Amino acid sequence: MAAIEYSGRDNLDVMAHAKNYNRFLLDLVLQNAHPDQSIVDFGAGNGTFAGPIAKSHDRIVCIETDPTLCAALQSQGLTVVNDLAELSDGSIDYLYSLNVLEHIEDDEAIAALWFKKVRPGGQILVFVPAFQFLFTSMDQHVGHHRRYTRTSLTRVIQKAQFQITDSYYADSVGVLATLLYKALDQGGGQVNVRMLRIYDRWCFPISRFIDHITRRFIGKNAIVRAVKPA
């Protein structure tokens, strides 16, 4: 598997304060998750999503390479595998990846590996940061190679031979917030917890409402759902 050199553990801890954002992502994942499916959290981090999902979906496997994060996942009783290549071909019903693909230099190789491991008819969900003009020191701090557009993300997934079932943007207000962060950025790449909480509590719900109008052309994140042809 292509190496993932992750340097953003502190960012994961900070993002735990974004309750509405995390609830949104969890709901996003659960839309396609069924209790009897084999599910893979690709880049499970500290278990923010795999932990709650495992309470009702016992066939979930966490893919994680960072030793510290692996230990955190195992302490929650989660099944952890370091390399997706270790799983049998065509064994996965549903794979989701949240804010991970941007960390991988050869994203096309990873998408091809997903295709190999997902069963025919199986589904994937990919959630990534959007728009290169929003690239900040925070992206650099946590090891992002790029940000995506709907088009560029779709291209990577289609090249792996998946069929796209939906693609859209999320968090329209987050575009303005990120531009403000970029304008005030002093290069540290850190997240202000107080400002994050304020945004998550008051702005993110508004953003979700506006997203119904803007989802096809603007948003801080890009989302793709796809299926492996049967």
Predicted regions and their residues:
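Short, glycine-/aromatic-enriched active-site segment of Class I SAM-dependent methyltransferases
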Residues: 12, 124-146, 150-156
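A C-terminal cap/extension of S-adenosyl-L-methionine-dependent methyltransferases
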Residues: 5-7, 171-230
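Conserved N-terminal segment of class I S-adenosyl-L-methionine
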Residues: 1-98, 108-113, 192, 197, ...
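Helix-to-beta-strand junctions that scaffold the AdoMet/dcAdoMet cofactor pocket
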Residues: 34, 104-105, 118-120
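Residues lining the SAM
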Residues: 98-101, 127
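A short glycine-rich, Lys/Arg-flanked "PGG" loop and its adjoining helix->strand segment in the class I
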Residues: 109-123
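Conserved S-adenosyl-L-methionine
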Residues: 162-172
